[in-house]
């Protein structure tokens, strides 16, 4: 599925809205994607994950050990991408306002992670989540999102993975 076909499917299911929107960040946009609505359709969620997963495979060439996502927005798409890549999935959740790895999730120090979000606007949730993974001894080697409104500019750079 190419990008044009995906956009058409998102419009058809009512998830892609066009007009004038003020985002929660205060930024303005001419389009708004209701990710929860798009991902509530299992076939569409799988197509979105396949589209992102193919790009991830091209860019990371089997260097990822785990897929991780911050709850809530990244949960469904993160799990779908992990299934496409045949990798373990885990998520971070907020406890008293801070992200934590809970529910028995664990990993070996030095493991490489791919962070998945539904939408990245300011990147603040991603930055917080990446810091937690790094503090626990993991390496976030990349991030993917359905929608990137950040302009590709993150304020935080994760350490580079060790070449193997």
Where do the protein language model's features map onto the residues?
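Conserved small/polar residues in nucleotide/adenosyl-binding loops
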Residues: 156-163
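Conserved acidic residues
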Residues: 65, 111, 141
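ATP-dependent adenylation/pyrophosphate-handling site
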Residues: 92-93, 138-152
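Active-site-facing substrate-recognition patch
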Residues: 1-59
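Glycine-rich helix-loop-beta junction characteristic of Rossmann-like nucleotide cofactor-binding loops
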Residues: 56-61, 105-107
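Short, glycine/charge-rich flexible loops or terminal/linker lids adjacent to PRPP-binding catalytic cores
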Residues: 77-114, 122-128
């Amino acid at each position: 599925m190419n990008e044009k076909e995906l956009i058409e499917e998102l419009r058809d299911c009512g998830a892609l809205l066009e007009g004038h929107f003020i985002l929660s960040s205060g930024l303005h946009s001419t389009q708004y994607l209701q990710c929860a609505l798009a991902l509530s359709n299992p076939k569409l969620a799988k197509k979105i994950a396949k589209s992102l997963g193919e790009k991830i495979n091209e860019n990371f060439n089997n260097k990822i050990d785990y897929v991780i996502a911050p709850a809530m927005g990244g949960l469904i798409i993160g799990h779908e991408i992990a299934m496409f890549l045949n990798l373990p999935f885990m998520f971070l959740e907020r406890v008293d306002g801070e992200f934590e790895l809970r529910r028995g999730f664990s990993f070996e120090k030095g493991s490489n992670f791919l962070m998945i979000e539904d939408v990245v606007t300011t990147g603040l949730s991603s930055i917080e989540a990446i810091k937690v993974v790094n503090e626990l001894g993991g390496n976030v080697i990349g991030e993917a999102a359905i929608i990137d409104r950040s302009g590709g500019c993150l304020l935080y750079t994760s350490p580079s993975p060790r070449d193997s």
